[in-house]
């Protein structure tokens, strides 16, 4: 059955496969899972992928960025200070990427995050720090990608420029383009934007030899995806994909946070919903409790001094049981099953044909989720891959394939949503149906003029599954101009859709009579312009320079502290160094300490003070060593003379 299907698929997707394998990538290729809550990076070691540890020693890095004065913090450092700096600490920004400000999901998020979300000049949703400076979601994502790039470079010992970046399978065109923009801003050449479940399937099936049909259930920090894939003879073919780009661990945290807020209000009468710092503490406590309830039946939530009233300090103290949390999250778990049903239907497979259900994403550790998946698919899910690392491992594997380091593996992915144009009467005419294997290209001639002597035609591109164009998401629009005057309906306009392996779409309109063409790359009706991306790259580079200078100053401070401590210890141990020399060291030590305490000291100034101290200590150390050696030599000589005298006396006595 599998071989027959794949032979058919192979013939249908021959052009796609040829384009997919058309060019070999040179240089290192890293795989990055840019997650909503956590991100990680992997590289190929030989024929096996490996997830790398960051500078803090962890394999997963919080997808959190903060601004504190002129300082930019990324990862764990940013997350640790979120409670005291909630308005300038950005988390879960991936949920905003490629979205318009008026999007209903954005309006929902505005009420639930401590930082501000505002409308940018192009109409997209951007975040804003406490000083009023706006950042695009792509820019914030770029700061996280820079951290991943740095992690890989530290491990490899060389610069890295190529990356495979994963994204939710149900991301639309603008969201994929925004993800690629984030990589560009971070200084990366994003050679593929690959669906997370597809990457996880690569990690799962890399060492599998048996033909199989699998489902990948990916419930992460901010998004949910379900994909059905067929694996046979090294070919990974995605049959169908579905999902919800606004369902994930953040929503589970939120439902538990709301419960804590409600219970606290019941017991104290105090509403904390408008207190940003308190909300951030509760959110962090909810996330911690959620994780603990995956392995324990109940957990304590204790937040001392959360607020105060006329009765004094108030504290959050409560016990949350697993059953209570599961009842709060029941609707969220059930929401994931709707896309599962649609995906199975679109893949045209029976549940009995699914031989394995692979769980991916941190939320799949929740017992309620595991049970729901088991009941839906009728089998115990496979939990043999690390749910936090599988996607990055798959990304690195795909990088190995593109470098031709990994042989005999082919990936055939799909576009998650239908793409088409608006035609007469506002109808949505599909050009590329959903779940079409990509890359793909399709042309169709159905446009013409609607009026006599009309010289231009407007093309509106939409993505979605509704029958009327207005009910779907408009991805972009452009005009084909210079059409020769002719009666209505005579000119023939050919429209071509061309989707890259990344899932990014290019649309071209051509007047068949004159050969004139006009094209557009689908980014978004807003999206980042080339100038904005270049400005953000410069901004990123300036941050990189300031970060480098800051790191160098920290290293110089650490060295100064070490030298100062050494000098203080030596001053108490020297026996042969003169008082004048000791006083000189004390003077230089005081100068070094003063420089260290100066918040505005430069690296060169502190280095100079440290070098003077170090040089003086070394001179005194040399004096100490020489004087001590001379003293030992004199003592040894005296002992030798005495011994010789005793031996002579003993000899005289023996002669007598």
Curated annotation (Swiss-Prot):
An individual GO BP term: DNA replication
CC terms in the record's Gene Ontology section: kinetoplast
GO molecular function: ATP binding; ATP-dependent protein folding chaperone; unfolded protein binding
Stored SUPFAM superfamilies: Actin-like ATPase domain (SSF53067), Heat shock protein 70kD (HSP70), peptide-binding domain (SSF100920)
Assigned keywords, A-Z: ATP-binding, DNA replication, Kinetoplast, Mitochondrion, Nucleotide-binding, Stress response, Transit peptide
Cystine bridges: none
Region entry Disordered, spans: 624-656
Highest taxon listed in the record's lineage: Eukaryota
Coiled-coil residue windows: none
Compartments, record wording: Mitochondrion matrix, Kinetoplast
Transit peptide feature, positions: 1-23
Ranges annotated as biased composition (Low complexity): 626-656
Primary location group: mitochondrion
InterPro entries found in the cross-reference section: ATPase_NBD, Chaperone_DnaK, Heat_shock_70_CS, HSP70_C_sf, HSP70_peptide-bd_sf, Hsp_70_fam
Residues in the signal sequence: none
Primary role: May participate in eukaryotic mitochondrial DNA replication.
NCBIfam families tied to this protein: PRK00290.1 (NF001413), prok_dnaK (TIGR02350)
Family per similarity comment: Belongs to the heat shock protein 70 family.
Protein name, as recorded: Heat shock 70 kDa protein, mitochondrial
GN (gene name): MTP70
């Amino acid at each position: 059955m599998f071989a027959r299907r794949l032979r058919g698929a192979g013939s249908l997707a021959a052009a796609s496969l040829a384009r997919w394998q058309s060019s070999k990538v040179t240089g290192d290729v890293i795989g990055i899972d840019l997650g909503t809550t956590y991100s990680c990076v992997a590289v190929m070691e030989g024929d096996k992928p490996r997830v790398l540890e960051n500078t803090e020693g962890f394999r997963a890095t919080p997808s959190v960025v903060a601004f504190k004065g002129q300082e930019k913090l990324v990862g764990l450092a940013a997350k640790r200070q979120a409670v005291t700096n909630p308005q300038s600490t950005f988390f879960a920004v991936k949920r905003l990427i490629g979205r318009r400000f008026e999007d209903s999901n954005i309006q929902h998020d505005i009420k639930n995050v401590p930082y501000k979300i505002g409308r940018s000049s192009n109409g997209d949703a951007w975040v804003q720090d406490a000083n009023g400076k706006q950042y695009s979601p792509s820019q914030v994502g770029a700061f996280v990608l820079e951290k991943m790039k740095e992690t890989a470079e530290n491990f490899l010992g060389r610069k890295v420029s190529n990356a495979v970046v994963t994204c939710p399978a149900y991301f639309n065109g603008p969201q994929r383009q925004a993800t690629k923009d984030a990589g560009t801003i971070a200084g990366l050449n994003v050679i593929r934007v690959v669906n997370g479940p597809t990457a996880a399937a690569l990690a799962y099936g890399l060492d599998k030899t048996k033909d199989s049909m699998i489902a990948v259930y990916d419930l992460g920090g901010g998004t949910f995806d379900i994909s059905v894939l067929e694996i046979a003879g090294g070919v990974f073919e995605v049959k169908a994909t579905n999902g919800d780009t606004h369902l994930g661990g953040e929503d589970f945290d939120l439902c538990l946070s709301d419960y804590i807020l409600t219970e606290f209000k019941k017991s104290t009468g105090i509403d904390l919903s408008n207190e940003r710092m308190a909300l951030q503490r509760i959110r962090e406590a909810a996330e911690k409790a959620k994780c603990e309830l995956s392995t324990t039946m109940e957990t304590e939530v204790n937040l001392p001094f959360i607020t105060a009233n006329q009765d004094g300090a108030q504290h959050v103290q409560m016990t949350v049981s697993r059953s209570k949390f599961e009842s709060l999250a029941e609707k969220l778990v059930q929401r994931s099953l709707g896309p599962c049903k649609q995906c199975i239907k679109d893949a045209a497979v029976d549940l009995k044909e699914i031989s394995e259900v692979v769980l991916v994403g941190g939320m799949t550790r929740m017992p309620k989720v595991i049970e729901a998946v088991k009941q839906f698919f009728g089998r115990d899910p496979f939990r043999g891959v690390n749910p936090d690392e599988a996607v990055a491992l798959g990304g690195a594997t795909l990088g190995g394939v593109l470098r031709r380091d990994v042989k005999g593996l082919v990936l055939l992915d799909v576009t998650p949503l239908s793409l088409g144009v608006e035609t007469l009467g506002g109808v949505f005419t599909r050009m590329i149906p959903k779940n079409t294997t990509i890359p793909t290209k399709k042309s169709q001639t159905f446009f013409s003029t609607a009026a006599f002597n009309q010289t231009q035609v407007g093309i509106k591109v939409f993505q979605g599954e509704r029958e009327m164009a207005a009910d779907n998401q408009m991805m972009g629009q452009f005009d084909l101009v210079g059409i020769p005057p002719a009666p209505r309906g005579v000119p023939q306009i050919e429209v071509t859709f061309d989707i890259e392996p990344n899932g990014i779409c290019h649309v071209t309109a051509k007047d068949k009579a004159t050969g004139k063409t006009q094209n557009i790359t689908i980014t978004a009706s807003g999206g980042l312009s080339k100038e904005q991306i270049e400005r953000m790259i410069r901004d990123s580079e300036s941050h990189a320079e300031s970060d480098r200078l800051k790191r160098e100053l920290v290293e110089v401070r650490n060295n100064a502290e070490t030298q100062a401590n050494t000098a203080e210890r030596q001053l108490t141990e020297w026996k042969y160094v003169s008082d004048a020399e000791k006083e000189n060291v004390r003077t230089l030590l005081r100068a070094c300490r003063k420089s260290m305490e100066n918040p505005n000291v430069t690296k060169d100034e502190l280095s100079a003070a440290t070098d003077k101290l170090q040089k003086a200590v070394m001179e005194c150390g040399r004096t100490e060593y020489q004087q001590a050696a001379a003293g030992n030599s004199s003592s040894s000589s005296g002992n030798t003379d005495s011994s010789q005298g005793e031996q002579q006396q003993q000899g005289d006595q023996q002669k007598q």
